[in-house]
Structures are given as C-alpha cells and as structure tokens.
Swiss-Prot record:
Catalyzes the attachment of tyrosine to tRNA(Tyr) in a two-step reaction: tyrosine is first activated by ATP to form Tyr-AMP and then transferred to the acceptor end of tRNA(Tyr). One of its GO terms (biological process) is tyrosyl-tRNA aminoacylation. It is found in: Cytoplasm. This is Tyrosine--tRNA ligase. Its EC number is 6.1.1.1. InterPro entries: aa-tRNA-synth_Ic, Rossmann-like_a/b/a_fold, S4_RNA-bd_sf, Tyr-tRNA-ligase, Tyr-tRNA-ligase_bac-type, Tyr-tRNA-ligase_bac_1. Belongs to the class-I aminoacyl-tRNA synthetase family. TyrS type 1 subfamily.
Length: 416
C-alpha cells in the first residue's frame, strides 16, 4: 500500500499493522481531518466475555479515540438472535433473550478498560442494536430495505461462498444477518452521524453491504476499514491457548493466565504484537522485536506487562509478573496462580489426578491429561507424575498442591 495518510488515525493504523483494507483510503482520510467523527464496531453477545481474538478491534477503537474521534461500541442484542455466518462451518446455536442480556453485561466490563465513556466530545457510547431491530415490522422492512439487496451479489461474498462450496447448509435466518448488519450501519449514520465501520477482514462483505445501503437509502457518505485476521507465526489463530480460549474477563481467565499467554509469545511474533497490542513507540517495538537469543525474553515480559496493564491494571500486571518470577525463577508457588478450590464432598471418595488436571484447566480432556502424564509432562509439587491412576483424598489436600503441565503452565488445588 503506497497511500500516504494525512490523518493521525489512518497513520497509526498503517504504521502499526492494523490495516487490511479500506473502501476509500483518501475519502476516509479527508473526512477524519474535518473534526470529531464517530466510528463503530459491532460485537455479538455469543459468550459472557470476548476473547483475545477481539482485542485488535478494541485497540482500533482505543486508537480512534486517542486520535480525536468518537468510538461507538455496538452490542448485538438483536443480531445475536440470528447469528453471523461469516466463515463458519456450521450454524450458531440460538440464544434466548436472558442469555444474550447476561452475555452483554459480561462483555461490557472489558470496554471501560480501553475506552473512555465520559461526556467529552470524544466520549464513547455503548449502544445495543436491539433498540431498533426488535421493533422492526417485517413487511415494511422487506419493502423498504430488502429491495436494495441483490441475492446474486450476496452469494458472491467469500464468507457465504466458502460455506456453500463446502455444501454446508446456510439457513435463511443466517442469510438475513448480512441485511441486519447493513441496517445497523445505516441506523448509526442516521442517529449519530457515524461515518465508519471497523471490523476484521471476515466482515468485509457485511461492511460493504452497509455502505451501499446507507448511500442508496439516505445518500450518506460512509466508509469501511478492516484489520487482518491475525494468526501467529506458526499459523495458529489468535484467541486460543493450550488450555482453551483466552477470555478477556478476569473471572474467566485470570490476569496471571493472561500475562502468561503473552509471555509465551513466539519469538517471531513479538515485534508485531507489541505494535498491535501496546502503545509503546514504534521504534521501541522494533528494537524489542529485533532482540535475539535469551534477550528476546525481556521483550516478551515487556509485552506481557504492557498488555496486561491495559486490560487488568498495573497492579494486576505486577502481581502476575511477580508470580511468574516466584514460580519459574525461585521454584515457589506465587500468589496469583490459577486456583481450583474443592469441597470436602468433592474428595470424599477421592478424586483422580487425571480429573484434577482437567478441572484445574491444565488439560482439555482426560485423554490429554493421561498423555501429559505418560510423556512425563505433568508434575505435582514439582515432582513428576507417573501414575495416571493416582487418587487424591482430603488428607493429601491438607496443604494446597501445585500441579504443572510442562514448564510454563501451573495451577494450585486446595480444599475450601
């Protein structure tokens, strides 16, 4: 991309690696020079927390605000009832209103760590598309909105085409998601003057639909900008750790686990992740990313500290770093290790070490836990576990025990 940006936001997006594509580079750039502009990202409420795969979009909104503009975080209280089919191999399970509301409440906790929701001109707004989608009249919607969409064109979008090419069913319900998301963009332009939708590159088709609809119905000049769908240097999708999803809510993935996830970054990804997930100056990101050998570990600790501070605060980051030092350098336990608390009833008949490894989050299944033990990858209180049939009773838990999977993942087990 040879375009040289004039606005601060576009300059940051391009310099730090956030930019995958834009519907009109020059048009958006010039619009952002005209004063405070609103932009939005939509987040469907399919779980009680977002995971780290959404963090690149949250950072885009943070930079949008830091460069003088107004972020809109749109909760999909309406669209979650339908489900986004983009690049999915199957249909999402449908959630009821109560589950969606509970999920929205959980997701909201994350945003205030990154975005200011004050009454300032650039203060963010938290919105819910159920406000306008829940009360739509179906026949009116078909007549006024549906006529602007070409089925031929919608079938050509890669997100739909890839599903159909695999001969996997795409329900009419899911197909309508694209129309509803397009309607969201138009409604946000009408209500708030929102000129920009941000999203991952898998949302390109949905974003383009919204731009076309807004121009056709109310002659609004709006834009779309997408970020790359991130994978690690070894081809793995961002959002997963060895123990499962990397959630952003502390009650679902502890600050220590979050810190450790970033500390375990592959050497080749350090520089790129520093640019995307921290606010360190670019030259410092490049310097740290260029370190080699044992020196790269210092860069990984900086990455873990910076990202954890943004989400969970400086105190939580410092505690996580200290716990890591206690565990890895001093052979101790640490105050912030993930902890599984069992009741006396849980261990009345004894509980197998395999179950404990799974319950503590160190393995996703009994099969994986047994493999860890068989391959000498599991330890209890730093002693190798060799017996997958070992039973743990209340007497063994009079003092907390430390379980380890490999060198980097640890958890405490205690009686409550």
């Amino acid at each position: 991309m040879t375009y040289i940006p004039k606005s601060d936001f576009m300059a940051v997006m391009m310099a730090r690696g956030f930019m995958a594509d834009c519907t009109d580079y020059q048009g958006l750039d010039e619009a952002l020079l005209k004063g405070v502009q609103p932009a939005y990202i939509g987040f469907d409420a399919t779980a009680k927390s977002l995971h780290v795969g959404s963090l690149i979009q949250i950072m885009m909104l943070r930079w949008f605000q830091k460069t003088g503009h107004k972020p809109l975080t749109l909760m999909g209280g309406g669209t979650t009832k339908v489900g986004d089919p983009s690049f999915r191999a199957d249909e999402r399970p449908l959630l009821g209103p109560e589950a969606i509301d509970d999920n929205i409440a959980g997701i909201k906790q994350v945003f205030s760590a990154y975005i200011d929701y004050s009454d300032a001109p650039t203060g963010a707004l938290m919105l819910n598309n159920a406000e306008w989608l829940d009360n739509l009249n179906y026949l009116d919607f078909l007549r006024d909105i549906g006529r602007h969409f070409s089925i031929n064109r919608m079938l050509s979008f890669e997100s739909v085409k890839s599903r159909l090419d695999r001969e996997q069913s795409l329900s009419f319900l899911e197909f309508n998601y694209m129309i509803l998301q397009a309607y969201d963009f138009m409604e946000l332009y009408r209500r708030y003057g929102c000129i920009l939708q941000l999203g991952g590159s898998d949302q390109w088709g949905n974003i383009v639909n919204g731009i076309d609809l807004t121009r056709r119905v109310i002659d609004g000049e709006v834009y779309g900008l997408t970020s790359p769908l991130l994978t690690t240097s070894d081809g793995k999708k961002m959002g997963k750790s060895q123990s499962g999803a990397v959630w952003l809510n502390a009650d679902m993935f502890s600050p220590y686990e979050f810190w450790q996830f970033w500390r375990n970054t592959t050497d080749a990804d350090v520089g790129r992740f520093l640019k995307l997930y921290t606010e360190l100056p670019l030259d410092e990101c490049e310097r740290l990313g260029a370190l080699a050998g044992s020196e790269i570990n210092a860069a990984k600790i900086t990455l873990a500290n910076e990202v954890t501070t943004l989400l969970h605060g400086a105190e939580a980051a410092a505690t996580a770093a200290q716990t890591a030092r206690d565990v890895f350098e001093k052979g101790g336990v640490g105050d912030d290790l993930p902890t599984l608390t069992l009741s006396a009833e849980d261990v009345a008949q004894g509980i197998s070490i395999v179950q404990l490894i799974v319950k503590s989050g160190l393995a996703n299944s009994g099969k994986e836990a047994k493999r860890l033990i068989a391959e000498n990858g599991a330890k209890m209180d730093d002693a190798p576990l060799t017996n997958a049939g070992l039973m743990i009773d209340a007497a063994a838990l009079q003092s907390p025990i430390k379980l380890s999977a490999g060198k980097k993942r640890h958890a405490m087990v205690q009686l409550g």
